[in-house]
Amino acid sequence: SIYHVYNMTAVAAVAKLYHIDDQVLANVLATHIVKNGRMEHFQLGDRSMFLNLAKNPVGANMTLRIMNGMNEEKELLFVLNDNIADGLDVSWIWDINFSVFQQVTRVITSGTRAYDIAVRIKCSGYSQDQIVVLPDLDAAIQELNAHPGKKFIISNYTATQPTRNALIHWISKNGGNVNEYNH
């Protein structure tokens, strides 16, 4: 995503500032692996899923833009918690631009605030018939994998690791893999 470009640009600028050898910099950039919920790719059976951490509207909007860049049917799982590390206030979800949904056939919501994010998505004009609320994460992963199409998962801070673990658990039982991309 564009954030990886920003981060790598910052790395290059600091390397130049401290006169780090160009070959060392090139090696670092070539071997950097994106993981832990940063557009991390999972293959659950024949279903391709991307997990992205979003701690604020900007992060969520970036994932939605990436989704829209893929011209095919897709589904979204949004996992929202309100634990102390997340900040108990989830009002930031009202600043997410859900009006950009294109070819999103279904949205599943999960987490401790699954109903809040479902209401937010419904208020953006998305059909209630296409929103599935499953606070239980394992049930949400199972439901997400039940239909064809590309899958995207947005999770906030404390939801990301449990979501990753649920995906890996599903893979260990049913087949698939985790693909860490070099960027």
Report the location of each language-model feature.
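Membrane-embedded hairpin module used as a gating/binding unit in multi-pass transport
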Residues: 1-19
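ATP-dependent carboxylate-amine ligase
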Residues: 13-20, 27-183
